[in-house]
Design a protein with these regions (language model features):
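A structural "domain/chain start" motif
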Residues: 1-26, 30, 35-37, 42, ...
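Surface-exposed short loop/turn segments
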Residues: 34-38, 45-91, 99-110, 114, ...
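Compositionally biased, intrinsically disordered linkers/stalks adjacent to structured regions
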Residues: 112-135
Length: 135
């Protein structure tokens, strides 16, 4: 294995975060650049990692006695298709999700960037471990 293709992450979630796909793409490319000797190519790599964001949701997770949300949770879900052109038995098709909780009295806008950064870190680690960490 000498090359990997990591195309731009597709965003298919209903709720929109305009920077998430780009940030996740950059983080994945950086992780593979730092921790592997694989050369990143635009197409036809020995390995290919296709990622799509399938969910971006905020839900209340803790309710107070007066039925107000005390904590909210931002969850990001992704689906990956990892193709190993030399060893197809190592192909991976899997879904991952990661979340972060935040104080429900805060607006999502005020905490979203920091939450997404942490969530992206978790997702990238999970994806890396599921695809090439066993080498």
């Amino acid at each position: 294995m000498k090359t990997i293709t990591i195309p731009y992450v597709e965003y298919k979630a209903l709720r929109v975060n305009p920077s998430l796909a780009g940030d996740l793409t950059d983080a994945l490319q950086e992780k593979f650049r730092k921790l592997t000797r694989l050369e990143q190519v635009d197409e036809e790599g020995d390995l290919e990692l296709v990622v799509e964001v399938t969910g971006y949701d905020v839900k209340a997770t803790a309710i107070t006695a007066d039925e107000q949300a005390a904590q909210s949770r931002l969850t990001v879900s992704v689906k990956i298709e990892f193709t190993n052109r030399k060893y197809p038995e190592d192909d991976v098709s899997q879904s991952f999700s990661a979340y972060e909780d935040f104080d429900a009295t805060l607006s999502l806008d005020s905490v979203e960037a920091g939450l997404c950064e942490t969530i992206i870190d978790k997702l990238v680690e999970d994806i890396f471990n599921a695809t090439v960490a066993q080498w």
